[in-house]
Amino acid sequence: MRAFDPDLLPVVVLTLRVTVSALVIAAVVGIPAGVWLGLARFPGKRVLTALVYTGMALPPVVVGLLTYMLLSRSGPLAFLEWLFTPNAMILAQTVMALPLVAGLVMGAVASVPHDLVLQVRSLGATPWQVRWTILREVRVAVLFALLVAFGRIVSEVGAAYMVGGNIQGYTRVLSTAVMMETGKGDFGVALALGGWLMVLALTVNLAAMRLQGRLA
């Protein structure tokens, strides 16, 4: 593979497909979970919070190993037949992104002055209306959480390689392509592919900055 090889386009497209799919799933689950954890008071909250924070720091290779074990022939999810497919990569990246989104949103919600929560409740707001109001209050922090999650999973190698297999034309993404070219000693191509990753990250960050200006 070369930096401007025609075969590069499917790799870029798959990178975006896997990353965006995982990020959307993590957002749909993680944002409501983070808001709930930030506002709720219940026994065992500290334990659950500790688990979320632990998940935020979980090494990608461990995520890859756990996902591999779940999807392998002897695993409980073997019937899905996802191992060495893009779906397996999406699952692994979702596992990495979800705690990040939930944890950062939870921290942002918990930092909202309690007086504001009481004020909203005193106006007769339902629990869902309270959560929605607080979510709007921390919308910039939510955007930041999604950016952090995107940055982590778009460049992830270990889990993607373990459960995807780096199969040309099927599960090869930019990060695993960089690793492959580096292993072959073709550092020029590896750097060029890394440049494509930087372009993706820069594009997303510029779009997020523009959106942040509208949200502020």
PLM regions: where:
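C-terminal transmembrane helix and the adjacent membrane-cytosol boundary/short C-terminal tail
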Residues: 44, 103-133, 191-216
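Alpha-helical transmembrane segments of multi-pass membrane proteins
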Residues: 13-21, 55, 128, 132-140, ...
